[in-house]
């Protein structure tokens, strides 16, 4: 379980990233966070693996407050919390396999990984992860030879290889076209259901949020302004979250726009 208790974050320049956030996210949930640019979506998601550090409150993962963690404790935390980024975060000049097996880095250590000394089971796990996102045929290609959608699938395979308890996906489809976006979201949803991995995704497109989320968290100006099941969400809910009328560019992730 992930629990935010009165969590606030003020950046060094005085910007309020999070404001008195109280949330509980249960094991195995598929949660989508929505809000305008600058609403605090990325700050919220990045606080869960301490890429940013809240300045007030407590942030508990499995009952333990992660805010006072040492760098050694953070390394251990990041082994069980996988992250998927908008820009894929792959080593472009390395092969697909080398990128995916780097998901084992926290398990084998830096020295072994530098020498490419991964156990056979890890190599087999990496290959199975590529098969699960239907990209195993690209295993020996360089990452920079792949399309954006293929690179994001490699990033998902890397997270799978990590065998995390939690997956955080920060705007994973923002750089992709609608059909590819749906493909990536379908893989994330499938992994969540099959492996029971808690999955938290930031999305801009509200129709896509409605299609894939079990639960939607709405943010505005660093505050949680809505938290409930996707089935309870209406257009009016999104207008309340966004503080304005819904526009066509909020919906370009929709199947009808493919």
Swiss-Prot record:
Gene3D superfamilies reported in the protein's UniProt record: P-loop containing nucleotide triphosphate hydrolases
Keyword Acetylation: no
Localization in the cell: Cell membrane
ATP-binding found in the keyword field: yes
Catalytic activity: phosphonate(out) + ATP + H2O = phosphonate(in) + ADP + phosphate + H(+)
Positions of the ABC transporter domain: 2-246
Bilayer topology annotation: Peripheral membrane protein
Main EC class the enzyme belongs to: translocase
Top-rank taxon, per record: Bacteria
Family membership noted in the UniProt record: Belongs to the ABC transporter superfamily. Phosphonates importer (TC 3.A.1.9.1) family.
Function: Part of the ABC transporter complex PhnCDE involved in phosphonates import. Responsible for energy coupling to the transport system.
NCBIfam families (UniProt xref): ABC_phnC
Name the UniProt record assigns to this protein: Phosphonates import ATP-binding protein PhnC 3
Upper classification of the organism: Bacteria, Bacillati, Bacillota, Bacilli, Bacillales
Gene: phnC3
């Amino acid at each position: 379980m992930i629990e935010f208790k009165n969590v606030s974050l003020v950046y060094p320049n005085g910007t309020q990233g999070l404001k008195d956030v109280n949330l509980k996210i249960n094991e195995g949930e598929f949660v989508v966070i929505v809000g305008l640019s600058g609403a605090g979506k990325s700050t919220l998601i990045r606080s869960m693996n301490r890429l940013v550090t809240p300045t007030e409150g407590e942030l508990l993962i499995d009952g333990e407050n992660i805010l006072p963690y040492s760098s050694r404790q953070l390394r251990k935390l990041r082994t069980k919390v996988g992250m998927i980024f908008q820009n894929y975060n792959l080593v472009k000049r390395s092969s697909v396999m080398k990128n995916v097996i780097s998901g084992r880095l926290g398990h084998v250590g830096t020295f072994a990984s530098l020498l490419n000394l991964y156990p056979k089971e890890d190599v087999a796990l990496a290959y199975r992860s590529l098969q699960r996102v239907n990209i195993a045929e690209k295993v020996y290609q360089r990452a920079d030879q792949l399309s954006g959608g293929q690179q994001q699938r490699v990033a998902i395979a890397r997270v799978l290889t990590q065998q995390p308890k939690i997956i955080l996906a920060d705007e994973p489809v923002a750089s992709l076209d609608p059909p590819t976006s749906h493909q990536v979201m379908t893989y994330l949803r499938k992994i969540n259901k099959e492996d029971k991995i808690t999955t938290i995704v930031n999305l801009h497109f509200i129709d896509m949020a409605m299609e894939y989320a079990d639960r939607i968290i709405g943010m505005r100006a660093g505050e949680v302004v809505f938290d409930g099941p996707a089935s309870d969400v209406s257009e009016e809910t999104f207008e309340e979250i966004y503080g304005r009328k819904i526009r066509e560019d909020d919906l370009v992730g929709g199947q009808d726009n493919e």
